[in-house]
Amino acid sequence: MSTERSNLSDRSGWTSFETDVAAVLDQLREGEVVTYGEVAAEAGHPGAARAVGSLLSRLPDAGFCWWRVVTTTGRLAPNCEQEQAERLRAEGVEVVDGRVRGLSR
C-alpha cells in the first residue's frame, strides 16, 4: 500500500477472520485490484467472499484499502461506487460504467 497504508497494528479484539483479511489487504499495492473471493482465498477462507464484503462495509474507518476490492465481474461497491471509482482512477485503474475495465479473472 501507499501512504494510505492502514495502521492496524492493534488488532486486539479482532476475530481471526478479520485479522487474516486485514493481512491480505495490507499487502495490496497502489493500482492493484482484487476480488472479494481472491481476498477470502488468500486469507485462508475460500468461499467467504460475502463475508469479506460484509467486513469491509462494517468497518469503513478501519484503514482498509477497500476501494481495491471488487466483485468477480469487476463491479464496484454499490453504496460507494463514485468514491471507489475516483480512488481507483487516481491510482491509474480504468473504470467504465461502474466496473474495472480489463479485470481478467
Predicted features along the sequence, with ranges:
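Nucleic acid-binding interface residues in structured DNA/RNA-binding domains
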Residues: 2-105
